[in-house]
Amino acid sequence: MSNSDYLPDYPLNSDLVKRLKSALDAKDEERVRDLICTEITPVDAVIELANDDWMKDPSAQLPTGMLLGDLDHLKPLMDQFFQDANVVFEINKDEMEWQVKSPATFGLSGLWTLEYKRELTTPLCIAAAHGHTACVRHLLGRGADPDASPGGRGALHEACLGGHTACVRLLLQHRADPDLLSAEGLAPLHLCRTAASLGCAQALLEHGASVQRVGGTGRDTPLHVAAQRGLDEHARLYLGRGAHVDARNGRGETALSAACGAARRPDEHGRCLRLCALLLRRGAEADARDEDERSPLHKACGHASHSLARLLLRHGADAGALDYGGASPLGRVLQTASCALQASPQRTVQALLNHGSPTVWPDAFPKVLKTCASVPAVIEVLFNSYPQLCLSESWKEVIPEEVFQMHKPFYQSLFALALTPRCLQHLCRCALRRLFGKRCFDLIPLLPLPKPLQNYLLLEPQGVLH
């Protein structure tokens, strides 16, 4: 049953809902508990917290004649809001709502929807969402249905979203369905999305939740959700309960691929690295391709994550793999280098080249120079992977003047090599690297050479070229 089929016991304009919304907005937990436990009847009452149906209470007073093709109504609106008959409409997800042109909408105008959008809930869902354990116990004791979900999500879903383990356990003890699907096709395990929800996931599994259940339009398993969110402890729990480490979602991704593709804040990188190491130890395929033929290494390089790239390369990832678009991992990191300065993208380039990645076709080097000009360390590492590269003075034109001045010593040393053979030391480096091939990273540190010379062989950037 969709939420449009429910008749709320407490509609949006009722006095109780107004007081409840006021308490929720003010974060007055005591008042919320009091309203839920003492004033709302019956125990499974349907409460309407929002109603955006424009036909009932439109934010823009659109005349009904417009829907009927009434030209007399259409012309004034066209004259007032847009003159271009081919106006582009801004659509948010699957809905269109009327918007007047304004700087906030960047000049785009939206339209309207006939969809009946409401936010319906129950006292139990509200209590579970806010972690009011005593209130949940009280409502269940009065016979509240633990699986009621008039708004599309049940109390278990709400408790898991909030990471309220005690509420989850109470609901499960009262026979809540641990695999209840929301209107979006998500089970409670799919909503264990934060570190605080680990106890919720544990309780769900103890009560028979399926660790392999796919959900939502993405057809993700709980392990995919944990991987996308960088939740290493959740992943450990799911794997211990029999989750398939290389299960595919609707985009053809494994959990490892999903983990490598998710954007991370700097403080999340360590946790993501632990998660990926765990998946690889449990047998995850390091080179698994998704529907676009992208490997986990492609995705790690797309974020210039050198520590993650090195981890994958140590587990056998192919440094020269090509996706459907013909892009290699090296190509991916070069595309993102100028936007990921804090990630030290030269480290990722260095790791790929030391594990056998083909370098860039010489004729394409000016394009790389243009793209990565603001990251001279990337240019240095890549340039040193060629025994000899014919430079042209015309290449200076692709470097913005302010960038050239900011990194003047490096670019002066680069163009000083135009029409000049590289030094013997560099040519010896290239000969050794060609001999070791994709094992440079493993074999060069074994050579009886001083550390600075080993670093030189491994293309460690020095700031200038010789």
Swiss-Prot record:
One of its GO terms (cellular component) is cytosol. GO terms for biological process: intracellular signal transduction; protein ubiquitination. The keyword Repeat applies. Pathway: Protein modification; protein ubiquitination. Residues 405-463 form the SOCS box domain. Belongs to the ankyrin SOCS box (ASB) family. The SOCS box domain mediates the interaction with the Elongin BC complex, an adapter module in different E3 ubiquitin-protein ligase complexes. This is Ankyrin repeat and SOCS box protein 18. It comes from Homo sapiens (Human).
